[in-house]
Amino acid sequence: MRRLLFACALTIASAAHADLCATGRQQSPIDIAGARKSALPPLAFAYTPAPLKVANDGHTLRVRLAGAGELRIGRETYRLQQVHFHTPGGDKVAGQEFPMAAHVLHKSASGQLLAVVVFFRLGAENAWLGRLWPHIPARADGDHAIAGERIDASGLLPAARGYWRYTGSETSPPCREGVQWIVLRQPVELSAAQLAEYRKHFADNARAVQPLNNRTILESP
């Protein structure tokens, strides 16, 4: 009887998650437009090199970076967790779509999730991605520790640190809301060959933009 009740509870929870993805009012990604200028604090990235560990989860390439530094925003501190990639880029800017974006995920001591978005545009070869792409696992079979390789997430970031901020959600089920999103305004570059290589493994793995539903988008100086 207890096992049956547990199975029923799981079914109800799964249905609730599916409903949130479809009916949530603070979902991500969004089309960033009409942002309000605000005296937002600067982003203080304090990332450190870490052993390279990657995973193909069947949906995206994940780079495991737990313990590899933190991001401080005013009095808030968020520990780096991982980086993964979407193509196309998910969030748009005034209707403009980017060919790819990186989501740099963080978590505070209280469990608050925060994602930093780095957009990519086509251009020169990206040296940071050049260290990752040769190690994309061919199939979803857990984490792969790359012997002798270390990586620093700082190498992914653009030089300018202006950003937009909004409250959104996870972009895949269960689509939990309350996630803080930091979208860096300056894109970085990747080559057409690098984009094509990623898309061999994970094509069209971005969620469509979601309604803003009267949320406020803030823009830093």
Predicted regions and their residues:
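Positively charged n-region of N-terminal signal peptides that target proteins for export
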Residues: 1-4, 95
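Small/flexible residues
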Residues: 4-5, 217
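Extracellular or lumenal secretory-pathway regions
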Residues: 14-99, 103-221
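Bacterial N-terminal signal peptides
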Residues: 6-13
